[in-house]
Amino acid sequence: MTLLQPFSALLLCLSLMMATSLLTTDKPEEKMYSCPIIQCSAPAVNGLPGRDGRDGPKGEKGDPGEGLRGLQGLPGKAGPQGLKGEVGPQGEKGQKGERGIAVTDDLHRQITDLEAKIRVLEDDLSRYKKALSLKDFVNVGKKMFVSTGKKYNFEKGKSLCAKAGSVLASPRNEAENTALKDLIDPSSQAYIGISDAQTEGRFMYLSGGPLTYSNWKPGEPNNHKNEDCAVIEDSGKWNDLDCSNSNIFIICEL
């Protein structure tokens, strides 16, 4: 339907009204019929939809929903250690324990035997100390130099000290060298626990390792006639010597 149709209907209605009025002038006795404009018009047509209105104000917060409860989450990390709590009250006294096992007679006998052996060792040690006091010895630092009072060659002197659980004396500093020379008789010599038998001209300690201290006489060591051993003289100076020389004092080191 076009927009001209309503107007056409209106014009038609007006025309009918005019025609009716003309008819009434000729026949007054007849009843007059009229056609209202509204009733005679064609049906109205719906217009286009209007624009959306503006959003209204925000509503109030609704009540919590009543959905299903979710699963429990994983445990969180352990928190920091709390402060030490106060000491609790003292507990009740416990029951009396069982009687301990008595020490057997066999254990008593073992203890008695050990005590007797200790007394024997103490007596022996006392005698050894007295015997040692009759010999020449000197303490220096943590060392003790003991003169055997005997003269041997190098190998026999080394063996003698080893039997006593010691080694041939070998001073490692000036203080030890001075203490060692004080044990030597005038115009005498004592073997030192060093040798260059393994490498000529390179003296080593018998226990291994190069020398950390020496006090050689001027021009020594000179390796005269295969002199692989060394001695300390009463002056404190060192000299290389033939190891087979048996006229040398033996001084041990503890």
UniProtKB/Swiss-Prot annotation:
One of its GO terms (biological process) is complement activation, classical pathway. Pfam families: Collagen (PF01391), Lectin_C (PF00059). Residues 51-66 have a biased composition (Basic and acidic residues). Its main location: secreted. Residues 1-19 form the signal peptide. The modification 5-hydroxylysine is found at K58, K61, K93, K96. Disulfide bonds join C161-C252, C229-C243. GO terms for molecular function: D-mannose binding. Residues 140-250 form the C-type lectin domain. The keyword Glycoprotein applies. Keywords: Calcium, Collagen, Complement activation lectin pathway, Complement pathway, Disulfide bond, Glycoprotein, Hydroxylation, Immunity, Innate immunity, Lectin, Mannose-binding, Repeat, Secreted, Signal. One of its GO terms (cellular component) is extracellular space. The keyword Transport does not apply. It is found in: Secreted. SMART domains: CLECT. Glycans are attached at K58, K61. Calcium-dependent lectin involved in innate immune defense. Binds mannose, fucose and N-acetylglucosamine on different microorganisms and activates the lectin complement pathway. In contrast to mammals, which contain two copies of MBL (MBL1 and MBL2), chicken genome only contains one copy of MBL. Oligomeric complex of 3 or more homotrimers. This is Mannose-binding protein. It comes from Gallus gallus.
